[in-house]
Amino acid sequence: MTVVLGALQAYRDIRPIVDRPDSFLRGDYLVLSKRVSALNAIGLGSGGFTSEELQELRSQPFVREVGALTPADYRITGSVGMGGVNLSTYLFFESVPDRFLDVEAADWDYEPSSRDIPIIIPRNYVNLYNYGFAPSQGLPQISEGIFRRVSLGIDIAGNGLTEHFRGRIVGLSNRLNTILVPDAFIRWSNGRFGQGGEKQASRVIVETDRPVDAAISAYLDGKGYEAEGDRRDSGKAAYFLQLAAGGLGG
């Protein structure tokens, strides 16, 4: 009876953690890309995933879901003012199906032709700014809350057009190391500024319930795929479960 009651209490305690979109107990995610070959380096090979390759990946026993990261097909320049310093750089945008997001972002939608673009950035960008760029430039560190209120100037050029937009940071991601915009924006903007034609996904995100399965490594090596994600959360999950087991056993 003690074990049963302990298990019920443990379930109640971890339920809020499991239900969070960035929970380490909701499966593991790998971002896959193809190894860059000599042909890719000189522009003679394709680094994208074909529809047949995506279908084969979905059929693997260790795969729950597969989502393609869709890249922007045009040039992007971003600018922002911080501490009296104006910063400008080239950017890249990608989109991913909403079910793969680990952020509950308000206003994560886009109406075609709107000048406002909601953006999700990697959380480590905040750390890079606070502990790398800011000290070297004599700029103040900023909190995540302030970071979310930063407004970016976005200039998009392509297909003979140049237009200005405003980027709003609406969330910070622990899962995806890319600058994310809504899928609706990528599709609309690629149609307006892109070169035309369907672009193959150069990266895909895979949800798996067996992140340390040797079959995954063997499959990736055999196909020439590389996994970009780390597995820090696997260690956290193992530690948590050890504590839970120890508590119930006692």
Role assignments for model-derived ranges:
Residues 81-85, 90, 100-113:
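Alpha-helical transmembrane helix bundles of large polytopic membrane transport and channel proteins
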Residues 65-69, 120, 229:
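A structural signal for short, well-ordered beta-strand segments and their strand-loop junctions
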Residues 1-15:
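Short, strongly hydrophobic transmembrane alpha-helices
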Residues 15-92:
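Membrane-proximal extracellular/periplasmic loop immediately following the first transmembrane helix
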Residues 210-250:
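Peri-transmembrane interface segments
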Residues 76-78, 104, 111-112, 117-226:
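Basic-flanked hydrophobic alpha-helices used for secretion and membrane insertion
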Residues 90-93, 119-121:
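Short hydrophobic beta-strand that contains or immediately precedes a catalytic carboxylate
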